[in-house]
A protein has these predicted regions:
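Oligomerization/assembly interface segments of phage tail-like spikes and tubes
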Residues: 53-65, 99-108
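Acidic-leaning, charged glycine-interspersed low-complexity segments
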Residues: 72-108
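Glycine-rich loops and low-complexity Gly/Arg-rich segments
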Residues: 45-48, 59-63, 83-87
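Short coil/turn motifs at beta-sheet boundaries
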Residues: 29, 50-54, 96-98
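Long, highly charged amphipathic alpha-helices
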Residues: 8, 12, 69, 73-77
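Residues that cap or flank secondary-structure elements
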Residues: 1, 65-66
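Short active-site-adjacent helix-start/loop capping segments
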Residues: 44, 68-69
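Small/polar-rich, solvent-exposed N-terminal microdomains that initiate assembly or binding
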Residues: 1-49
């Protein structure tokens, strides 16, 4: 992953003040490493009342999943932005022969 891409990710994380996130990657190399974040967004309804909705943002980071240096860096960014994260669960998705492991991170 290029340094420019990493800078964009850091900027995106800071801008969105992400509350929680999880990371996912494909078991095949060089497929997207994705940071998904869910944040609560305030909206004003037509009648003037305030409502809140959940918004999910996906930030794509391309790199070889065996590149542990980048993995550590992405996790460091998440920890710095969102506080400490613990893996709270995993889910396995099979789609067109690609097995994906999704790790859910919840604020400790």
């Amino acid at each position: 992953m290029s340094k420019t891409k990493l800078k964009e990710v850091i900027e995106e994380l800071k801008n969105n003040k992400i509350a929680c996130a999880h990371l996912s990657y494909s078991t095949r190399q060089n497929l997207p490493y994705v940071i998904w974040s869910t944040d609560e967004v305030e909206c004003t309804c037509a009648d003037g009342s305030i409502a809140y909705k959940e918004e999910t943002i996906a930030l794509e980071v391309y790199y070889n999943k065996n590149d542990t240096k980048t993995t550590d860096k992405v996790e460091e960014i998440l920890n710095a932005t969102c506080g400490t994260y613990d893996t709270s669960g995993e889910i396995y998705i099979e789609d067109e022969g690609v097995c994906e492991v999704i790790y859910y991170f919840a604020s400790a």
